[in-house]
Amino acid sequence: MDDEIAALVVDNGSGMCKAGFAGDDAPRAVFPSIVGRPRHQGVMVGMGQKDSYVGDEAQSKRGILTLKYPIEHGIVTNWDDMEKIWHHTFYNELRVAPEEHPVLLTEAPLNPKANREKMTQIMFETFNTPAMYVAIQAVLSLYASGRTTGIVMDSGDGVTHTVPIYEGYALPHAILRLDLAGRDLTDYLMKILTERGYSFTTTAEREIVRDIKEKLCYVALDFEQEMATAASSSSLEKSYELPDGQVITIGNERFRCPEALFQPSFLGMESCGIHETTFNSIMKCDVDIRKDLYANTVLSGGTTMYPGIADRMQKEITALAPSTMKIKIIAPPERKYSVWIGGSILASLSTFQQMWISKQEYDESGPSIVHRKCF
């Protein structure tokens, strides 16, 4: 599809915003979902200091800014800052005029109704888009894997959801949310590295720990056995060079960190692990469709990128499910961006073109149109 009239696809996550053009196979812009404001107004005269910074620029100037994440646990909580992020997305990252392109936005499962209306209102009234649509993130991930029925375990920076989907429709009564995701794992890794004698406390150091997590952590197939191996040999140790040249060694922390996904008690949480949450979601569904869900369990989001996570999910869910059940965990290599990719696929389908909410429909019905057209 031509960039000229291509739809824009914007996936706003708690940690990162992914944006680009429908028909592309990957997002053109990926930047942190943060808005920063100067802590001290006008320290430097004539610097042309802005009153707010978004994304990477906010990240790089974080020393002089107060940073805010407008999306908490997948749900927008600060609309003024959210508007700034969208403005930055259209004008600075994609360099397009939003009034010339249809816009596909994504939303968290179980997003409050008022929130979808607010998104719709901002798109039509602030950005004057000709058409828009709001799709549920997990459903897009399932489309990206080439399916319309299955259960998606979507885990990002701020929240994890298990979403059973049948023939393209999410089943709201069976969706479960777990407030344990990437940011919590980064914090936990900071904590256990401190126990080893390395001190990471500031927000800048948190970014370093996030990098350590992304490069060195993995999920053990058998946690107890892995702990024993780590204790008896140094075969699992890896070294990491900090920005100042200091080299640190990390051993059992490599798999203790993501183990919290399966044992939230590590973080002092009483919730079920991701395997049990997935199983519980399936059990809330009609008995006739469970077989299809077990055989189509799709992982999605950055926090599912750990090596070993699919094998471990397979093992854990097999232990919970009926013994004759066929269980298949699908972990597509591009799952970090599969929500965006699903949006790109959906928005470029010829059959989808009549699904858009047009400016005209919005003007006739107001923001509540979103509940009738997007489900």
From Swiss-Prot:
Give any extra note attached to this record: In vertebrates 3 main groups of actin isoforms, alpha, beta and gamma have been identified. The alpha actins are found in muscle tissues and are a major constituent of the contractile apparatus. The beta and gamma actins coexist in most cell types as components of the cytoskeleton and as mediators of internal cell motility.
Give me the gene this protein comes from.
actg1
Q: Give the species this sequence originates from.
A: Triakis scyllium (Banded houndshark)
Known InterPro entries for this protein?
Actin, Actin/actin-like_CS, Actin_CS, ATPase_NBD
| Modified sites of kind Tele-methylhistidine | 73
Q: Where mainly found?
A: cytoplasm
Per the record, the similarity remark reads: Belongs to the actin family.
- Entry EC number(s): 3.6.4.-
* UniProt KW keywords: Acetylation, ATP-binding, Cytoplasm, Cytoskeleton, Hydrolase, Methylation, Nucleotide-binding, Oxidation
Q: Where in the cell is it found?
A: Cytoplasm, Cytoskeleton
Instruction: Write down what this protein is called.
Output: Actin, cytoplasmic 2
Provide GO CC annotations from the record. cytoskeleton; dense body; focal adhesion; plasma membrane
Modification after translation, per record: Oxidation of Met-44 and Met-47 by MICALs (mical1, mical2 or mical3) to form methionine sulfoxide promotes actin filament depolymerization. Mical1 and mical2 produce the (R)-S-oxide form. The (R)-S-oxide form is reverted by msrb1 and msrb2, which promote actin repolymerization.
The superkingdom of the source organism is Eukaryota
Spell out which residues are annotated as carrying N-acetylaspartate: 2
